[in-house]
Amino acid sequence: MHLPLEARMKREPRFLPPLQSVIYGYTRRMLDQTAMNAQSFAMVLAEKYLSLTAPDVRGVALRIGDDVAEDMRNNAQVLRRYMDGTVKTLPADLVDAWMLALPEPYRGECERDLARRRGVLPVRLPTANPAARVVGVAELVSEFAQLLEVIAPALADGRIDTNDLPFARRILDESDDVIAAVLGIRGQVQAMFQQENTDA
């Protein structure tokens, strides 16, 4: 039995962009679309990095001290060196701080894209804070509204087909966000239920 030529041919490898390129892309977009500038973002990044990374393992020269102006210059220079490619690799100990320094919606979108590379959805961990539960429901409603907004043009003709390819990426993104929000609420309810059973 002979396989068709297409089946015998190897697929061209499809490489993912480097993780840091995804993070830098969202950072650039955030800097272009918000009032935050590189210096203020660098200070938020420094604060997150210094609070998350133990002093004995820090490898990045971010700092917050008594001379705020000098710290701003230093931290902005560190940020620039990563983003302009002078420093070729984003250190693993800086990735989490960088992600947490990004404001929403850039952080959520970046987390979603990075998780999608591995075939998973980013879902927030359950919390015992009652205010967080309300935020979870509000997030679900908001994400569902955004899904409806992007799916409406695709459904305008009563069906989804190849003519709707221009909408496909946003529909996938927003549906992933709805699923993640539902799973987040489910996790909160499940944690509450388990707590109730252990208290009984």
Swiss-Prot record:
Protein name per the record: Uncharacterized protein XF_0503/XF_2124
Q: Whose protein is this, by species?
A: Xylella fastidiosa (strain 9a5c)
